[in-house]
Amino acid sequence: FVYLYSVLTERYKNLTKEFFDIYGKEIRTETGSSTCLTVGSLDIGAGTSDVTICSYEYNELKPSQLKPTPIFWDSFDYAGDDMLRVLINNILLEGQDGILQKELSKLGLEASQIYSKLFDFFGADHNRLSFKDRMVRRDFNAQVSVPIMYYFLNLLSDGEQFREISYDEIFAKQSPSQVVIDAFNEKMGIDLKSIRWTFDSAVMCKHIEYAMDNLLEHIAVIMYAYKCDIVLLTGRPT
């Protein structure tokens, strides 16, 4: 409703009929016909993605008054945190685009050795992983992986195409704890502060599409089924 209010008052100068004629559709009612506008909204938060669809009708005698009718609302347990996990795993850690995997390969390690190092430090809990190791893994993700990916997402939002980024640039305001740095250096055999983190917008977009494609396909079907005239995307990941 805030969206409609701002658009009608700021852009259309309260010319409600013209706005509804452009974006809305005519429907039949008991008293004849009227023009309605169906607005779908997707709010991608950290933990859930919330979908709402609402139909609006206006009164020709009082065009400033809109009658909202909610017709669909639901939440999906896939959102920004899930996308962030995919980006960290596929861009920072492992795979064809994994920066750490590339750094380990420069040491002349075989694929099995690289996988073992990455799994021992970042993988799921296993019987060789001590409580201290689990805490270090958690702290590394919170103090290193997440800040780097947020930095990448900000570069993407700013329209940056390609950059190599130093440790000092990313952690200029707050550095990871020395315990985390020392544990990483010991386990990986790499100096964390010497790594050049390569930002590539094409790689970012590829993995964002991979992470969100399934969710967006399902939501697109819902929006189409309810014949949405306008679709709004909100939330930080958008």
Enumerate the predicted regions with their spans.
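Glycine-rich phosphate-binding/hydrolytic loop that grips phosphoryl groups
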Residues: 1-13, 81, 85-89, 210, ...
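Intrinsically disordered, low-complexity acidic Ser/Thr-rich regulatory segments
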Residues: 24-38, 123-142, 190-195, 199
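Generic recognition of flexible, low-complexity loop/linker segments
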Residues: 25-30, 37-41, 72-77, 217-223, ...
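Phosphate-binding glycine-rich/basic clefts of nucleotide- and phosphate-handling proteins
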Residues: 53-188
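Glycine-rich phosphate-binding loops at beta-strand->alpha-helix junctions
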Residues: 228-238
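A short acidic Gly-Thr/Ser loop motif
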Residues: 33-50, 54-57, 79-81, 235-237
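Adenine-nucleotide phosphate-binding core of ATP-dependent small-molecule kinases
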Residues: 184-223
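Nucleotide/phosphate-binding catalytic cleft detector across ATP-hydrolyzing
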Residues: 1-39
